[in-house]
Structure formats: C-alpha cells, structure tokens
Amino acid sequence: MTVVDAGFDSATAPLRAELLAHCYRMSGSASDAEDLVQETYLRAWKAFHRFEGRSSVRTWMYSIATNVCLTAATARRVLPVGLGGEPSNPLEPVVPSTEVLWLQPLPDRALGDPGEAAVAREGIGLAMVAALQVLPAKQRAALILRDVLEFSAAETAAALETSVASANSALQRARASIGDGAAQEGRRAAELSDHEKQVWDEFCAAFERHDIDGVVRILAADATWEMPPIPGWYRGAEAIGELSRTQCPAQVAGDLRMVPTVCNGLPAAAMYLRSPAADGAGGDVWLPFQLDVLTFTDGELTHVSAFLDPADLFALAGLPAELR
C-alpha cells in the first residue's frame, strides 16, 4: 500500500456507513446502494491526488456519491401501497410483478456499529425513503443534503454542481412535494415499549406455531400488509389472516422459523421456510423466504411490509443462508 493509498483509506473509510445510507436514500435499493458506494470509492480514489482540501473530505465524498447516484438514477422504486390501488382480495392468486422497481429495506447490520455514524441512521425509515422516491432525483438529493445531512446551501450547491439559487429552488420544490409523506413512520426498534416488544415476539412465535388466529389477534384491526414483488396490498387483520391461511406455503407448526432483526431502524423478522435438504445430509433445512418489517403506531402493529425472495437482504443483515 502506498502512502497515498493509506491516506485515502484513513480519510474515507470511516465515512462508508453514512455514504451507504446516503446512496440508499437516493436509490431506494439496498443492493444498488452497495454498488453505488463502491463506484463512489473508486472515483474518489482515482481523484484523491487532486483533492486540495478546499472542503472537508466528508463533503467531497458526499459530492461524489451524490453525482454517482444522479448518474445512475432510474425509475422510482415503490411499495405496493404506494401504487394507489384498492386493497386486494386475499382469496385471489398472488402474482409477482417484474414490471415495477420495488423499494427494498436496508438491514441495520449493513450500517455497522449502532454507536457509530449516527447520521447514517437518520432519514432511512421505510416511509421516509418511499416518500423520497416520489421526487425527481435532483430534488431528492437537495432535500437529503439540506434536511437530513444538514449541509449548508453552498455545500449543497457544490455537491449538485449548480448555483445556490438553483439548489434552493430544488429544495423548495422537494419540500412542497413531499409534504407529510413520511409522517406515518413507525417506532424505531430501539424505542419500542415493553408491550410493543412483546407483540414483536408474539408475531414471530405465532408464525412459528402456524397460529394464524394468533397473528390476527396481534395485528391492529385495520392493519395493512404488503408483499413486494406482489403488487397488491391488504387491509384489515381478518383479511391478512385469510391471506396467510390461503396463500402462505407453510402448512403446519414448524414450517417457519423466525429470527428477529432490525431494518431501516424498525423492528423486523427474518422468515425461513422449511425445505428438504438438498445436500444429501438428510433431514430438513430452513431457507430464506421473507423479510417482514413491522410498523408500530400508538402501541399497535399497524403495518407489515413483507419482502419476498430476500436472500441478498439476509446476507446484508448478517443472517445465515440457512437454518438446520
């Protein structure tokens, strides 16, 4: 390692977690955010010998990351409830949609030690990130830089490679568009009451017992449930119970195993589904099936975002690829 390489690593490595969060806010995708951070570090390393210290290394890295995200910007990512349709019938077949870019959760484990880089954990709630995706990419960047990261108007303009007046205009339009779009964010896992923690535990236990009636009792009466990449969503504890009875491949107690985790700062549960072992070892193996992110409002479990086909997300969360 050269002196320049060592200097680059010592100056930029501590910023990785917050840059990952920034790229996630911009992209709405945990897996894309990883790629965007890698591209950010590659560009920064190539340009480090030209860095003159006119701004802090942190501001410089955010400028690079922001422009990487703007260059890579695609169609906005959404959750099923954000598509604007009516609640679905739980008795109708569920069919995944590959025509929509779906929002992904971000496992907290990907952000490293909870005691470090607190800024990485600001503004990453699912409702907030979903609301951000509604904005044009440049407005999204302006809002994140000013209102989440608390950059100055001049720093924001520099990161966006535009004038202060233009950056302020983008910020004003973003604030007007987003309104209270993130107002229904749930309680963070670290702030749950004892009652809410108990409901979280009971949610996991009920699915492991295949106790659908128990799941219904745990949910708020008007709870909502979504399962990207399934485009439909469901309203009401009874409807959600019917969905679980008729559509879930688990049939008996023990088919599912649940591992509590945290995503986007919110309580979550990694769901593993029993499958015959394919390695000739005999017995059963439980494989990643679903990642449930829970929203608690006023002490009740009011919403579940259940992400299907979550193997990559399990890896980001530091969860095992299988259970035996």
Annotated model-derived regions:
Residues M1-A21, S31-V37, W45:
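A short, charge-rich alpha-helical start-of-domain segment used by transcription regulators
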Residues E52, T66-G85, N89-P96, D180:
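Arg/Lys-rich amphipathic alpha helix in sigma70-family domain 2
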